Amino acid sequence: MLKKIDPAQTESWKRLGRHYDGVKDLAMDDLFQQDPDRFKRLSMAFKDMVVDVSKNRITDKTLALLMDLARETGVKEAIAMMFRGDRINETEGRSVLHVALRNLADTPVLVDGKDVMPGVRGVLEQMRLFSTRVYSGQQTGYSNRTITDIVNIGIGGSDLGPKMVATALAPYARKGLNVHFVSNVDGTHIVETLKGLDPATTLFIIASKTFTTQETMTNAASARQWFLEGAGDPGHVAQHFVAISTNAAAVEAFGIDRDNMFGFWDWVGGRYSLWSAIGLSVACYIGFDNFKRLLKGGFDMDCHFRDTPLEQNIPVVLAMISIWYVNFFNFPTEAVLPYDQGLEYFPAYLQQACMESNGKSTDRNGNLVAHATSPIVWGEPGTNGQHAFYQLLHQGTQIVPCDFLVPAISHNPLGDHHALLVANCFAQAEALMKGRGEQEVTREMTAKGMDGEKLGRLLPHRVFHGNRPSNTIVFKQLTPEVLGAIIAMYEHKIFVQGVVWNIFSFDQWGVELGKALASQIFPELADHETVVTHDGSTNGLINVFKQMRSKTCRS
């Protein structure tokens, strides 16, 4: 079992508090002036990736104290527990073993004394056989035409992870093969997705462990109806629908061949499941060999995380620096800013991974947490964000620690595009750190012929105070291995934060209440009766909806 220690009561936390009082006003620019080797000392290399944490409001003592906190709260022991299959998801009585899905070593991974690896390898082989047929063009539909479009129907982890990876690794896709993702129960999502598709060349992947997930099965039923309107014969469903599920009876009742049912396990959380059969859409789209490379990248980072001392452990360092900002500087948000269009869904993916994992207010003792937990995670690809919210990053009243991610080599070299992109990335990180003081702004404005009252009036608006922290992750190219390593790095960062904060990171009870209430409201929408069973606001909203719908229907 994980330690159950209130971190705020530890000696290391208290020492960090005293240390914060002494360093909170330190200027990062001064730290660089004092230490010409700061970048060299505070950047970490891993495979084809460098993680630079030098632009943070930290000193060597800060890092030492943060590592003391990690040790005192049992981070190293928690890492070992996860890898050996202990039931660290205590509220659900489950192991947490997404690392087993990408375990490429010839070593067992045990749950209750049973090795899960034969089952993992069995599903991977099933995925290999099926995805190879799709990727190679051998998989045909009822009219013997090659499959050209894959539609993945899922929600949450069954959607965000595969969608993010498929988008990021699109350069590895087979020409003529397209992938689409449907998650929202809003009918517009599936209707717009299916427009222009041909039932005879479309493959549907239904991702629902229980095959009862309301949003997913509603969309699946609509997809089946659309398909049959074109195909006619219900017998053709088996050639065009596959399931990622463990409910064989429901899968077969839907019309899916049991041989096309891909299983996974309760020790895989949804937001950590892209490495499992949930990644089937990715394997079909980019080919199984490239999917295996994704697993290899994750596995390599797992080995680093499991075996590297805390001080040099990239996920641990990132986690502890984040805790420094969340709990001592009281910075409530973090921005994820990928300077690679392929990573356009990465901020949303991390938003779920972080906020669903660590957005908790009850600690492992069952008490209310007295300290902040998960930051709000958000972001957009550069340079789009620069023309949207970077104004706040540079001059707003809230300081937002940022993660910049940028490749050295683009998959789509085009003139000066990539060099301009990279220049913007590095410039933004530098500007956040250095800012621009009054003297520099005055010189610049004077050189442009501005002086006197106008200069004095505009000067305060053009000053950037700087000292705003960021990490920069530079990688050679967005390959499957690099992406796998980056995803695993952030997964482990999130895990370490949850351990230190004394919360359970692998449940999501906060999702359940809204789902239960929706099940109560849904039948109340079917008639014209006035609803009085909820609070005044909810009753009012339901009844307004009914009135509006009724008027629309009559018109």
UniProtKB/Swiss-Prot annotation:
Pfam families with a match to the protein in the record: PGI
Q: Which residues form the active site?
A: 356 (proton donor), 387, 515
Pathway per its UniProt entry is: Carbohydrate biosynthesis; gluconeogenesis; Carbohydrate degradation; glycolysis; D-glyceraldehyde 3-phosphate and glycerone phosphate from D-glucose: step 2/4
The record ties this protein, via InterPro entries, to: G6P_Isomerase, G6P_Isomerase_C, Phosphoglucose_isomerase_CS, SIS_dom_sf, SIS_PGI_1, SIS_PGI_2
What general EC class does the enzyme of this chain belong to? isomerase
Any idea which GO molecular function terms this record carries? carbohydrate derivative binding; glucose-6-phosphate isomerase activity; monosaccharide binding
The alphabetical list of record keywords is: Cytoplasm, Gluconeogenesis, Glycolysis, Isomerase
Could you list the residue ranges forming a coiled coil in this record? none
* Main function: Catalyzes the reversible isomerization of glucose-6-phosphate to fructose-6-phosphate.
Name by which UniProt lists this protein: Glucose-6-phosphate isomerase
